[in-house]
């Protein structure tokens, strides 16, 4: 499963870069980096005419958790060794009519293994129809696998992005999830589902 997830993240990264370049004519800058223990990743950054700043990054690393982390990470108390692979996408557009988009997904293994991640939008201007469409797409995909997923993971995202000092949310939310042993991202045909939901948001 680890290699399957790694390959899926790499293919998704290539597709996201390709589809972003359809509307953004500036090219991405790529930079590889190495992890101090083992592994590394590929940073793909852009500053363009439509995307003010953006990054589509992948990584695959392994190592050992320190004693503090061993107590907080599932399965690490039995064995501190870990491997992780994932993708992180952040797109901040020039136009206030286009929302900022954040998306990340990871697969982590200790003595246990699981998927985690999330996706959210932060618009400058409120477009109710588009906000409803975004959440309906997420709900539709989640409901294919478990009707409890969407309300549970939407609530988690809403709570995380609630600004207590302002008494208001940041953006329109999305979903957060963690500790899924059989993630909806990796069960056919869900990768196609997630791409259909995600790409219009990033454009």
For every predicted segment, state its role.
Residues 2-74, 184-188:
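Gly/Pro-rich turn-and-neighbor structural signature
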Residues 17, 21-25, 95, 106, ...:
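Hydrophobic/aromatic-lined pockets within catalytic cores
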Residues 27-30, 150-154:
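Flexible, glycine/charged-enriched surface loops at secondary-structure junctions
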Residues 42-117:
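Internal mixed beta-strand/loop scaffold within catalytic domains of large alpha/beta enzymes
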Residues 93-95, 111, 121-127, 178-185:
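A generic structural motif
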Residues 113-149:
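Compact, glycine/acidic-enriched structural inserts
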Residues 155-180:
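A short mid-domain helix/strand-loop element embedded in enzyme catalytic domains
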Residues 186-203:
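Single conserved hydrophobic/aromatic residue that forms the stacking wall/gate
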